[in-house]
Structure formats: C-alpha cells, structure tokens
C-alpha cells in the first residue's frame, strides 16, 4: 500500500529549491571539470519546482511524485538537465494519472514544464525498441529506458505549459 505525505509548496520551500538548484549547478560544474559525467538533476529540486509552478502537492511518501489537489490525480514527473536529450526509466509498477516532463536550460537557468497528456496505461504502448513496447518490458519486470523528448515531446509536438525562471524566481504559465 502506498504511503502518502502531501505537502503544499509555499514561498519558503520554493526559494529553498531555487537555492538548492544553484548549489547543485555549482557542484555539477566542479565535478564535470575532472570527470566526464556530472550529477543528475536531483528530483528533490525538480519535483518541488514542478509543484510550485503547477499548484500540485508534493508527495513525500510513495506512489507518485505529486498530487493535483482538486482532482486528486497522481502526478509522475521526470526531468533532464540536458536540454537536447534524456534517458528516462520507469519502474515495472508505475501507476499515475499524468506524466509531466521537466527540461532544464542550464545556460539560461530556466526550467520548462511539459504536460505530456500521458498516463501510466498510455505509457505502456510506447515502442522502446523494434520488438517491444514499454509495457512488454515492464511485464518482464524490467525498467525500460527511452527518451521522453524523442518519443513523447517531439513525436507529439508538445509545447511547455509553464516556465520557471530560476534567476528571477518567476513562474510563467505559457
């Protein structure tokens, strides 16, 4: 059974997430100076920023990353700090009502938020290789990996619904 601990993101939590973003960015740059690979964009930052921008409640328990308070919809979020590409994985037991994708433009410190219009059932039909769908791989107990940018955002011409300007701490609905 899923444990839920929903939190409304107030101004203080939003500002803490923005501060954490800039600390992550600085640490990531230091690490990339001596290693090929940087640090993944922390979900504690991306999920908080998503909730602040969209009015969702952050789930600090299990069973989805957030909740839409009016409809009780379970929100799953995935994020990338690489604007051009991503590799995302989903657990075999994913269950959500709406998938949101967060795409970070590090150069300009802007986070773009996309409502993919996809739920966990829709996700199962996405072709992840020549012979299998995401659902096929989940049924085998695997964590399928694919690009949300390529297979969902670009394939369906999805535009962002919001932008977070991290330098100015502005949230803009698009």
UniProtKB/Swiss-Prot annotation:
Keyword Nuclease on entry: yes
EC nos: 3.1.21.4
Protein name as annotated: Type II restriction enzyme Bsp6I
Organism of derivation: Bacillus sp. (strain RFL6)
InterPro entries: Restrct_endonuc_II_Bsp6I
Entry superkingdom: Bacteria
Gene Ontology MF terms in the entry: type II site-specific deoxyribonuclease activity
Catalytic activity: Endonucleolytic cleavage of DNA to give specific double-stranded fragments with terminal 5'-phosphates
Entry keyword set: Endonuclease, Hydrolase, Nuclease, Plasmid, Restriction system
Record GO biological process: DNA restriction-modification system
């Amino acid at each position: 059974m899923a444990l839920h601990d929903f939190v409304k993101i107030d101004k203080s939590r939003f500002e803490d997430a923005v501060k954490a973003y800039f600390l992550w960015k600085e640490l990531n740059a230091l690490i990339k100076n001596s290693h090929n690979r940087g640090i993944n964009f922390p979900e504690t930052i991306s999920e908080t920023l998503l909730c602040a921008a969209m009015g969702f409640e952050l789930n600090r328990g299990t069973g989805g990353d957030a909740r839409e308070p009016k409809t009780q919809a379970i929100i799953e979020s995935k994020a990338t700090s690489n604007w051009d590409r991503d590799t995302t994985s989903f657990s075999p037991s994913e269950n959500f009502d709406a998938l949101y994708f967060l795409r970070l433009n590090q150069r300009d410190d802007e986070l773009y938020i996309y409502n993919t219009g996809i739920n966990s059932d829709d996700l199962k039909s996405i072709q992840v290789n020549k012979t299998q769908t995401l659902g096929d791989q989940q049924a085998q107990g695997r964590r399928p990996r694919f690009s949300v940018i390529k297979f969902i955002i670009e394939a369906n011409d999805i535009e962002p619904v919001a932008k977070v300007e991290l330098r100015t701490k502005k949230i803009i609905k698009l």
